[in-house]
Regions:
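Asp-box/BNR beta-propeller loop motif
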Residues: 6-26, 55-76, 109-127, 157-179
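Signature of short aromatic-glycine-proline-rich micro-motifs recurring in repeat-based ectodomains
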Residues: 82-90, 134-136
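Loop/turn-rich, solvent-exposed surfaces of beta-rich toroidal or solenoidal domains
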Residues: 150, 156, 176-196
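Entry beta-strands of beta-propeller and related beta-repeat scaffolds
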Residues: 1-2, 40-44, 96-98, 143-147, ...
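Repeated scaffold domains used in trafficking and secretory/extracellular systems
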Residues: 28-35, 131-136, 183-188
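Short glycine/acidic-enriched loop and turn motifs that connect beta-strands
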Residues: 8-9, 48-52, 104-106, 152-155
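Oxyanion-binding "anion nests"
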Residues: 132-164
Length: 196
């Protein structure tokens, strides 16, 4: 049995039980979310320390973690980051992985092969300020996904804060625009619900 804990600020530490298995001392290090594909392989994401999101991956039950090079990741936009609001910035279905970003730009990083290769998809969710964008993302299956967020400084705003996809994240549509709920930091599908 293993328990993992991820600290958010520099120095960023990732613990497996009580042992430090990853440490990052970059002054901009700030990790937001962690998830596992299976008993062997996992991923954690954080804000950019260079010109891409910070992504670390383990392939050995969390004993060691390797940070992906920005050469292998989509370039981050100015002011693009992620939110540590609910630990739901990462959605996993099988080998497929979606990472929600927010802030000045709010996009979805996507990998079909457990983090080996990455692409990026645009979203219509509210963005353009440090406090706006996706705060949470979930997928029911490889095609159907939902993301929610908004602006936590304007919790009652309901414009462009809820989006969904039916093509695996390639395209997104705003839903319930101008209707509740306002800002939210977590969304989850109920298993075996057909995504309803």
């Amino acid at each position: 049995l293993a328990t993992f804990a991820l600290s958010i600020e520099s120095p960023a530490f990732l613990f497996k039980n009580q042992k430090i298995v990853y440490q990052e001392n970059h002054p901009k290090a700030f990790y937001d979310s962690m998830a596992f594909w299976n008993d062997e392989e996992g991923i954690a994401i954080g804000d950019p320390t260079e010109d891409c999101m910070s992504i670390i991956i383990t392939r050995d039950r969390g004993e060691t973690w390797t940070k992906l090079s920005c050469d292998d990741l989509p370039k981050a936009r100015e002011g693009e980051a992620a939110f540590a609001a609910s630990d739901t910035n990462i959605a996993i279905v099988g080998d497929h992985t979606w990472v929600a970003t927010g802030g000045m730009a709010s996009r979805v990083l996507y990998s079909s092969d457990k983090g080996e290769t990455w692409s990026v998809f645009e979203t219509p969710i509210v963005q353009g300020k440090a406090t706006t964008g996706m705060y949470s993302i979930d997928f029911y299956d490889e095609k159907m996904g939902f993301a929610i967020g908004g602006d936590y400084t304007k919790p009652n705003d309901t414009l462009a804060n809820k989006i969904r996809t039916t093509d695996g994240g390639k395209t997104w549509q705003v839903v319930a625009d101008g209707k509740g709920p306002g800002y939210r930091s977590c969304v989850q599908y109920i298993p075996n619900s057909n995504g309803k």
